[in-house]
Amino acid sequence: KMAKEKKLKSYGDRQYVPHVLRYYSFGRIPSGIGNGAIVQVALTQEGNGGTTYWSWYGFQKRVSWCACFTSWCADQCGYIESGVIPKFSLCSDGVKQFQKRKQFKDGSYVPAAGDIIFFDWGENGTIDHVGIVESVTKGTVNTVEGNSGDRVKRHSYPIGDNRIYGYGVPKY
């Protein structure tokens, strides 16, 4: 009704939820709580396939989509538009962008929720995969990852696992 009165096609702000979610950031708390907004967005996607994420990024056909998923989650929180997290579709580009910002830590770092975790499965220096840190408990980093068996899944790894290449540590 309001849109019609104003002679508009629609009324409202499509970015309302991402704008609001930005204010639910819990900061960098040493307890491992970190930033909860991006984690909550990621958890709502558990079990989903990749079409939403790679098509959102602009790809016309299926690609390896773990980085697209991570960027999509950041976008839902308004973190790409605000510059908190860089948009990337390649894991190696994500690492480079966090390094350029001086927001990258190696695999020995103890992360917090909302940090971006990068993997080197072959332990050969190639960054193969990326996910979002959900939490850290008792020496274990818990993650939400896209394109894990072609689904969004949760995983756990020991802190310092040799397959963890490092972490992007956004300034929320």
Where on the chain are the PLM-derived regions?
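N-terminal capping segments
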Residues: 4-82, 171
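Aromatic- and glycine-rich peptidoglycan recognition patches
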Residues: 2-33, 123-172
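Surface-exposed loop/turn and secondary-structure junction residues enriched for glycine/proline
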Residues: 56, 60-62, 68, 72, ...
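...with weaker cross-activation on analogous glycine-rich loops/strands in unrelated enzymes
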Residues: 1, 36-39, 80-150
